[in-house]
From Swiss-Prot:
The keyword rRNA-binding applies. GO terms for cellular component: cytoplasm; ribonucleoprotein complex; ribosome. One of its GO terms (molecular function) is small ribosomal subunit rRNA binding. It comes from Clostridium botulinum (strain Hall / ATCC 3502 / NCTC 13319 / Type A). This is Small ribosomal subunit protein bS6. It holds the Pfam family Ribosomal_S6. GO terms for biological process: translation. The gene is rpsF. HAMAP family: Ribosomal_bS6.
Length: 94
């Protein structure tokens, strides 16, 4: 098991309930694959440094989790097929 950190930005057109539902969805992906979510930090709505997909702000979330080496690939796939995700990044913590 390794420690990972992911930051993802969700579309700002979501309401607060939709934002939290998406965060729970991603937590569920991690937990269903046998991983554990260590920390979730909801940064809220912030302005982007530059426009992405014609959007200038988004909901930022930082999530730390522990999982096997295959889970980041699955989480990346889920991020890519979720329309509300503007950007995401998954890194290994040392």
């Amino acid at each position: 098991m390794r420690k990972y950190e992911t930051v993802f930005i969700l579309n700002p057109t979501l309401d607060e309930e939709g934002y939290k539902a998406n965060v729970e969805k991603f937590k569920g992906v991690i937990e269903n694959a046998g991983g554990t979510v260590d920390n979730v930090d909801l940064w809220g709505k912030r302005k982007l440094a530059y426009e992405v997909k014609k959007v200038s702000e988004g909901y930022y979330t930082l999530m730390n989790f522990t999982a096997d080496t295959e889970l980041p690939k699955e989480l990346d796939r889920v991020f890519r097929i979720t329309d509300t995700v503007i950007r995401h990044m998954i890194i290994t913590q040392e």
